Amino acid sequence: MRIEQVIADRYCAAVLIDFTAPEGTILDQDYYAFDRSVSATSRDGVKMQTYGIGWEVLPSSTEDETGRHATILMTIHSLKGEFNFIGAKVKLTLDGLYRDNCLEELVVPGRWSCTFTLPETDPGRLCTVNEPIEIEGKNAVLTTLYVSPLSLTCEIKQGTDDLKETVEPIYSDDGKESIAPEVTLQNGETVGAADWLFLITNYADERGRYCFRMDEILDPETVSSVSAFGETFSVE
C-alpha cells in the first residue's frame, strides 16, 4: 500500500491510496473499505473528537493486467466541534481491506500505519452570508458558505423556527432537494453536487453544517455565486 496524495480543506481531508493485493487476489469491485483508526491534532493543539469516513474506488491511471490494483479515495471529516484540518497532524492506521463498510467480508488482511501533516494553506474561500433562508416554510439563517476544490459547505443557525423541525427535510432527502447546492462560475458554467460528504446538525448550539462533493473539482477563485436553499448568494 502507498499513500499517493493527501489534500485538505477546512472541514475535511482526502487521502489517495494506491493498493496492490497479493498474487491470486483480484480487486474488481466498485467498493472497498479499510478497518481504520484515525487521530488528528490541529495546528492549535485541538484533538479531533469523533470522525466520519468515506470511501470511493477511482479509475486507475495505469494499466493493470493482473487485476490486483485499486486506487481508493478516503475522505475524513470531523463529526463534532470546530476542528480545522488545515495544518493538522494525522495518524492513520488501516487494518485489512474489506468488500463492505460493515467490515464483514475481508479481502486482504494486514495492517498499515502512517503519520502525516496536512498542508498549511487553506485552498478554499470562506464567505460570511448571514441571510435568512427557508426550508419547506421553516426559517433559518445561512451564516457562511465555504468553497474549496474538495467541497462546498453551507452553515446555518436557528432562525425564528425550531432548528430540529427546520432541518428534517435535509435528512429525508440527503440534502439533495432541500439544499440543492450549485455554483456558478465566472464564465457562466454551473456545477452541481455529486453527493453529500456529511450532514451535521448540532442542536445544542443551534447550528448545522452540510458539506457536498461537487461534480467537478473547483477553483474557488473562479466561483462567482452559490445557490443553496432556493436562493443565490454572490461570493465575489
Kindly label every feature range from the protein language model.
Residues 1-236:
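Alpha-helical, hydrophobic structural elements that either
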